[in-house]
Amino acid sequence: MQADHKKITRLLKTARGQVEGVLKMVEEDRYCIDIVNQLLAAEAVLRRAHCEVLRAHLGHCVAG
């Protein structure tokens, strides 16, 4: 589970950084399409984190 924890933590920290960047873009009144693209990138990382949490759950809680 430790490797899963590290991977999930890394993904969530990446997502946090992306969301903070999006917030800064909004505050700076940046171009909407650029903001949307960054939001899509953040969503993709959150989806990966979601899948990793589910995979870890299946591997450790359901199967174990």
Task: Give the positions of each predicted feature.
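Solvent-exposed interaction patches of small proteins and small membrane subunits
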Residues: 1-64
